[in-house]
Amino acid sequence: MKSAAVPKSARRGLLALTVVLLLLVSACTERAPAPEPTAVSAYGAYVGYEPSDTARLMALGAWLGGPAPRVGHVYLPGDRWSNIEGAPGYLESWAAWRRADPRRMFVLNVPMLERSEAHLPDGTVAAELRHGARGVYDAHFRVLAGRLVALGVPDTVVVLGWEMNGTTYTHRCGPDPAAWRAYWARIVRVMRSVPAQRFRFEFTPTRGRDAIPWPRCYPGDEVVDIVGMDAYDAPRGLGFSGQLDEPYGLRAHVRFARAHGKPFSYQEWGLFENGDNPAYMRGMLTWFAEQRPLYQSISDYCPHGVWSCRSHPRSTAVYRALMSAEGA
């Protein structure tokens, strides 16, 4: 439709009004704060799983002298299905800790198969993964999801089948990567089917190649919410720069997560085969400060820790100084 003619005086008025509005928008834009960097990463530690360990976690924060830990991190035993279903009573205490402060995160490691550290042969593992991919074990994960919702922690970060690229656990990926991916995705869909859940599912390999390149195990963006990494100071003699730049190392992990549009995390990290190594400790904490993971949680027991473990005084000093300065 052809528009009606506008008088010159009206056009001048409209032009003036437009200029004023543009200036106002510009002024508002200039006064608006620039996007801030990602907030300081939440931190926590694995200090144990007993009910009393919730207090120990907070004591770690008091020792650091800064903000309290916001990440509570525990594991479900993988010896039998009843424990993978969430039977252990200590979950109640950790759920209560999480509910006490909406800023907190509850991170729960969940094995994918029972007899999780029984060192079963590859053929048995492959058969078990295929059973899982066909739905044989769905009911166990449905029970777990219902328990977590009933405990008031429907937003639990579920670290499912961690360190799958290694050989430690029965839920390892190497014997049948396709079945592993299908089974992992199936568990996620089963748990997401439970009403009122808001779980976040974390895919967490170990740093480096290990037994299989961990990207081969990645089950897909639709079923992964967080890309984690377990990053201990190993093997012996490998410096921090090597840990950054090795194939499937720290730098590759962050690039992978960002390429897939996922936040990243470090649910396990700490000292290991290189002993009391302040260079590693400084390197990891500097990496966190630069990259801003969603959260990081040190394994605070020997041979990994810096607070409960008294064997690493130089690394302890670095951890305390940098974490206190960071105000994590």
Language model features: what each stretch is:
Residues 2-33:
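Secretory targeting and sorting signals
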Residues 37-51, 263-328:
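Substrate-binding cleft of secreted/luminal carbohydrate-active enzymes
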Residues 57, 207-222, 275-284:
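Distinct, well-ordered alpha-helical segments
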Residues 81-203, 314-319:
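Substrate-binding cleft of extracellular glycoside hydrolase catalytic domains
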Residues 90-97, 102-105, 109-111, 219-274:
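Glycoside hydrolase catalytic-domain groove-lining segments
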